[in-house]
A protein has these predicted regions:
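Cytochrome P450
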Residues: 1-397
């Protein structure tokens, strides 16, 4: 199957495609972005692939990906293997801690309230949720966290959109990568000269017990990853989550009735049911291996369909419980893969969860009559298979 031949239909609703593939087996050879790759759609096989020692994340070793004219971009945790990955994650985790994330709660709430104030003041009781709320909230949070000046944030939104839009998440225009890398080089240099209380300054300062620290290229790579991944995921979590709630009035009513008890589980179900990241980025087979009963030869490109795995009946079906195609905010025993699994599990997951819970709860409390705008017209979906979401979500209240 060539998924790109069905791009418009697939972008609008990929789940029937995944269901058909899963029914035929957990691993398939198909065409993605004009290139042949293996696609993993079963939950158990996805967990195995995400943590398989023979599946490398090193893009530079693959003929499929022609990234980087900009080496610093690839010097981040997402695109490296142990022991380099282990070292990078250890150094970053020293500063990007649960305590630091939790300390952001009051500021996230303050930013949220300000954006909702601005939405409420718009004429006609209408707004595009993506432009007015889902984008500026996580963009403001991650830029403040890293110490990016306010005037530069619009550029980051543009760069980020250009980088994640391609089908495989790696075919971005080299000029965009070069522009963003050049900016980050200047930002890191400025922080080194005049450090602040932000995370980027902390990453520049941090050293482990042996005196090891991040190199300039590694700092640029980590800033790149945190800025792009640190807001794109949350944009789509908010957008997809609100779409799911509005499409399921019973679930929306239940959440409104008991936000304290249900908001945490609701966000987890949003992540599972229609998560923000559709496919994990490519992995590459270092040796011949078997996955889901399928032989995958050395050098093959492998992509894990997180969205397919999170609707696998083999994982999410049990007697007396709703099936995986049902949106149920009271679902227990989640085990979803929206943030990945294994050594590459998303380090920013706690921040995305914090923002998602505050954003969605506050939105529902502010607008009791929230609904999709009936005059909005057809939805525009994000291109490619990396991210899952809409480019705009017109609402009324």
């Amino acid at each position: 199957m060539d998924l790109t031949a069905h791009a418009e239909e697939f972008n609008a609703d990929p789940y029937p495609f995944y269901e058909a593939l899963r029914a035929a087996g957990p691993v398939h050879r198909l065409v993605l972005g004009g290139e042949r790759a293996w696609l993993v759609v079963g939950h158990e096989e996805a967990r195995e692939a995400l943590n398989h020692p023979a599946l490398s994340k090193n893009w530079l070793g693959s003929e499929l990906i022609e990234v980087t004219q900009v080496p610093a971009v690839a010097t981040n945790m997402l695109d490296t293997d142990p022991p380099h990955h282990t070292r990078l994650r250890r150094l970053v985790a020293r500063e990007f801690t649960a305590r630091r994330v939790e300390s952001l709660r009051p500021r996230v709430q303050q930013i949220t309230d300000g954006l909702l104030d601005a939405m409420e003041a718009l004429p006609g009781r209408r707004a595009d949720l993506i432009a007015s709320f889902a984008v500026p909230l996580p963009m403001t949070v991650i830029c403040e966290l890293l110490g990016v000046p306010n005037l530069d944030r619009a550029r980051f939104r543009y760069w980020s959109g250009e980088i994640v839009a391609p089908l495989d998440g790696a075919g971005a225009d080299p000029r965009v990568l070069e522009e963003m890398t050049a900016y980050l080089f200047e930002l890191v240099a400025a922080k080194a000269q005049e450090p602040g209380e932000d995370l980027l300054s902390a990453l520049i300062r941090t050293r482990d017990e042996d005196g090891d620290q991040l190199s300039p290229d590694e700092l640029i790579g980590m800033a790149f990853l945190l800025l792009v991944a640190g807001h794109e995921t949350t944009v789509n979590l908010i957008g997809n989550g609100v779409r799911a709630l509005l499409a399921h009035p019973g679930q929306l009513a239940a959440l409104r009735a008991d936000p304290d008890g249900l908001i945490g589980g609701a966000v987890e179900e949003m992540l599972r049911y229609d998560g923000p990241v559709q496919h994990a980025t490519y992995r590459f087979a270092d040796t011949d291996l078997e996955l889901g009963g399928v032989s995958i030869p050395t050098g093959s490109s492998v992509m894990v369909a997180l969205a397919a795995a999170d609707r696998d009946p083999a994982r999410f079906t049990a007697p007396g419980l709703p099936g995986p195609e049902v949106f149920d905010i009271r679902r227990t025993g989640q085990g979803h893969l929206a943030f990945g699994h294994g050594i590459h599990h998303c380090l920013g997951a706690p921040l995305a969860r914090l923002e998602g819970r505050i954003a969605i709860r506050s939105l529902l409390e502010r607008f009791p009559g929230l609904a999709e705008d009936p005059e909005a017209g057809p939805r525009d979906w994000l291109p490619g298979t990396l991210m899952r979401g809409v480019t705009r979500l017109p609402l009324c209240w």
